[in-house]
């Protein structure tokens, strides 16, 4: 599905979630309370996306799924894939990598209530569709490991998925992020399992040239066992239940 179609579908879904919450006047009762703000910003990504498409954003918009629907589901049920999620929706979308303390959630962007629901919806879809999950790896940022925990009930933090603490990256810093994350993308999962990674936009772009947008988007990769991988599909949070 094209990025334009996915964006339209995402915002329709967000509108439904907000509307239902308002009608039901529900109060979240999770063990760790999600943030109350529901702001969705159209500008400014974690790495500072602008009004015009960058090369990475254009690559995301132009990406064509190699497998979709029942074919994709069947492939995932057999295992052997790495599924890289950009964390679920946050309160606001801005770059926080310079000042954020990964050990203190109050210094970071945090998941909104929509983000919490997105993560839970993803996890329910994986269970309902019987998509086997082995390792679940997240960055050390709260929005990443909370997405992983809400969706899959487990995670191991890995600093190789963290941002480098700079507002604007040099070519050398982008290369360093690529060197950090690539081993996770090319590692073949255990037989019959899929590896889930929950990270960030710039990290994925450094290794693939694709800026994963919007938040909550996932890319399905197939490691070939020879140090490379193939990009198979991208998925919005609500698309998993439709496979």
Where are each of the predicted segments found?
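Active-site-proximal alpha-helix that buttresses catalytic centers in soluble enzyme cores
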Residues: 55-159, 164-167, 210-243
């Amino acid at each position: 599905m094209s990025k334009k179609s996915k964006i339209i579908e995402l915002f329709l879904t967000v509108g439904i979630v907000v509307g239902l919450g308002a009608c039901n006047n529900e109060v979240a009762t999770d063990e760790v309370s999600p943030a109350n703000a529901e702001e969705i910003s159209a500008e400014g990504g974690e790495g500072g996306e602008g009004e015009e498409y960058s090369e990475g954003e254009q690559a995301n918009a132009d990406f064509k799924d190699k497998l979709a629907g029942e074919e994709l589901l069947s492939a995932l049920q057999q295992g052997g894939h790495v599924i890289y999620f950009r964390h679920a929706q946050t309160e606001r979308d801005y770059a926080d990598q310079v000042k954020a303390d990964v050990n203190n959630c109050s210094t970071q962007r945090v998941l909104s209530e929509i983000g919490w629901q997105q993560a839970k919806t993803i996890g329910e879809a994986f269970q309902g569709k019987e998509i086997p999950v082995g390792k679940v790896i997240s960055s050390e940022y709260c929005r990443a490991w909370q997405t992983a925990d809400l969706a899959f009930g487990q995670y191991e933090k890995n600093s190789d998925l963290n941002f480098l603490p700079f507002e604007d990256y040099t070519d050398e810093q982008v290369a360093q992020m690529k060197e950090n994350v690539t081993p996770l993308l090319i590692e073949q999962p255990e037989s019959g399992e899929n590896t889930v990674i929950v990270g960030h936009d710039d990290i994925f772009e450094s290794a693939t040239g694709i800026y994963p947008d919007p938040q909550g988007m996932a890319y399905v990769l197939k490691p070939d066992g020879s140090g490379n991988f193939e990009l198979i599909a991208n998925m919005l949070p609500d698309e998993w239940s439709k496979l």
